[in-house]
């Protein structure tokens, strides 16, 4: 029955009760839209930025309603959605499909989260022209920002090329899943003085090139905190990089405890103490905002 005491017809939403993603409209509409300018201001103000991956309309709308600032349509979908062992096989077409799903879910819910979409392996490495063609397609699919991996000179050149043409960029420094084989497997990066210095130099170059955000993955806490303090305008987002970054990101499946393998040290299962998925999302946002996640002793690396 609906609120007027009348039974709804099968397959038809009750009066005043919105179906699927629209059910989150009332919550999400209370927040201002997250923009690149808003991200920059949060960084300056010291307000933690909560980022979460999502790959479809329903979960994207739920994450947005829970207060997630940015939703990342990551090429991690290759592993959690497609069953691959790495992200290398994810295509641009895959990314476009899932970006459209997320964008439509947030739009339907009148949401406010900023959407970041990955440029997958092979979609930007050939040339600046290939990079912008791929990035434009992702923006047309609903992304507000594109993410690409690496900090070598040619990657920095692509970042600058895209930014100069009006495409916001999120960079991604070690561990970058697309290059996991070249880096010798999934392991913490930047522990030697030489490796740490390279990460500092790469991060500075990406900052100067105009990257709005930068994911720092599996980097010692002290190094990630130091890099964050050296940024002129780029907001750092940590995953296994300690609590000193401007924000945090987790793969949705990981933070819900849905993992077929061994859970990474930097992951916290927010579903364990939640009665449902939206509650788990809200708990994650609250923990990022108040600084209780990550706990450097439990989730960080020395």
UniProtKB/Swiss-Prot annotation:
- Class of this enzyme: transferase
A UniProt-annotated Pfam family: Pantoate_transf
Q: Which GO terms describe its biological process?
A: pantothenate biosynthetic process
Q: Which residues are involved in binding Mg(2+)?
A: 75, 118, 149
Residues binding 3-methyl-2-oxobutanoate are 75-76, 118, 147
Gene Ontology MF annotations = 3-methyl-2-oxobutanoate hydroxymethyltransferase activity; magnesium ion binding
What disulfide bonds does the UniProt entry report for this chain?
none
Q: What is its main location?
A: cytoplasm
Q: Which reaction does it catalyse?
A: 3-methyl-2-oxobutanoate + (6R)-5,10-methylene-5,6,7,8-tetrahydrofolate + H2O = 2-dehydropantoate + (6S)-5,6,7,8-tetrahydrofolate
GO CC annotations, alphabetized = cytoplasm
Q: In which pathway does it act?
A: Cofactor biosynthesis; (R)-pantothenate biosynthesis; (R)-pantoate from 3-methyl-2-oxobutanoate: step 1/2
Q: Which cofactor does it need?
A: Mg(2+)
Q: Which residues are annotated as active site?
A: 217
Q: What is its EC number?
A: 2.1.2.11
Q: How is the cofactor bound?
A: Binds 1 Mg(2+) ion per subunit.
Q: Which UniProt keywords apply?
A: Cytoplasm, Magnesium, Metal-binding, Pantothenate biosynthesis, Transferase
Q: Which InterPro entries does the record match to this protein?
A: Pantoate_hydroxy_MeTrfase, Pyrv/PenolPyrv_kinase-like_dom, Pyrv_kinase-like_dom_sf
Q: Which domain of life is it from?
A: Bacteria
The entry's family comment says: Belongs to the PanB family.
Show the PANTHER family listed in the entry: 3-METHYL-2-OXOBUTANOATE HYDROXYMETHYLTRANSFERASE (PTHR20881:SF0)
HAMAP family reported for this sequence? PanB
* Protein's job: Catalyzes the reversible reaction in which hydroxymethyl group from 5,10-methylenetetrahydrofolate is transferred onto alpha-ketoisovalerate to form ketopantoate.
Subunit details: Homodecamer; pentamer of dimers.
Record's protein name: 3-methyl-2-oxobutanoate hydroxymethyltransferase 1
| Chain's gene name | panB1
């Amino acid at each position: 029955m609906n609120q007027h005491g009348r039974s709804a017809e099968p397959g038809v939403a009750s009066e005043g009760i919105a179906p699927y993603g629209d059910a989150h409209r009332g919550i999400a509409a209370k927040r201002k839209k997250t923009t690149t300018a808003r991200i920059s201001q949060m960084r300056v103000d010291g307000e933690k930025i909560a980022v979460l991956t999502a790959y479809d309309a329903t979960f994207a709308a739920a994450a947005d309603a829970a207060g997630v600032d940015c939703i990342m349509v990551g090429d991690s979908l290759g592993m959690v959605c497609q069953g691959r062992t790495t992200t290398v096989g994810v295509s641009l077409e895959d990314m476009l499909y899932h970006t459209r799903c997320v964008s439509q879910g947030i739009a339907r819910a009148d949401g406010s989260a900023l959407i970041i979409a990955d440029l997958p392996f092979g979609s930007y490495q050939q040339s600046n022209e290939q990079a912008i063609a791929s990035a434009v397609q992702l923006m047309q699919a609903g992304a507000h920002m594109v993410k690409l991996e690496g900090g070598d000179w040619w990657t920095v050149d692509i970042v600058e090329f895209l930014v100069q043409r009006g495409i916001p960029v999120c960079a991604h420094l070690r561990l970058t899943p697309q290059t996991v084989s070249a880096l010798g497997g999934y392991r913490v990066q930047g522990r030697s003085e030489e490796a740490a210095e390279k990460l500092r130099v790469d991060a500075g170059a990406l900052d100067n090139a105009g990257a709005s955000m930068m994911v720092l993955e599996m980097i010692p806490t002290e190094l990630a905190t130091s890099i964050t303090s050296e940024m002129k305008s780029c907001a750092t987002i940590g995953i296994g990089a300690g609590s000193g970054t401007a924000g945090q990101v987790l793969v949705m499946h990981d933070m819900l405890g849905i993992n077929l393998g061994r859970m990474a040290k930097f992951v916290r299962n927010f579903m364990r103490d939640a009665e449902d998925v939206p509650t788990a999302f809200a708990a994650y946002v609250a923990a990022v905002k108040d600084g209780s996640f990550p706990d450097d002793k439990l989730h960080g690396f020395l």
